[in-house]
Amino acid sequence: MGKEIKMAYDDAGDILDISIGDPEEAISREVEEDFFLRVNPVSGEVVGFSILNFRKWFKGSKDIKTLPIKAELAVP
C-alpha cells in the first residue's frame, strides 16, 4: 500500500514541507534554488521535499512550476 502525502506550512519561515508518509529524519539536497528533496540517510529513499520562500515562488503566480523529480501516485 502506498503512503499518504502530508503537508505543513511554516508561515514564519515561509517553508512548505511535503512528506511522503509520516515526517521522518532526512538529509536535504537542493535540486533547484529553494527546492529541496528530503532523503532518508539509511535507505536513500526520497521521503519528501521542501520549498523555501514559498510565497515568493507562488504568490500571485499563474505559472505552473515543475520540479526535477518524478512521482507515482495512486488513489486508494
Placement of each model-derived feature along the sequence:
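Small, basic N-terminal interaction modules of short regulatory proteins
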Residues: 1-76
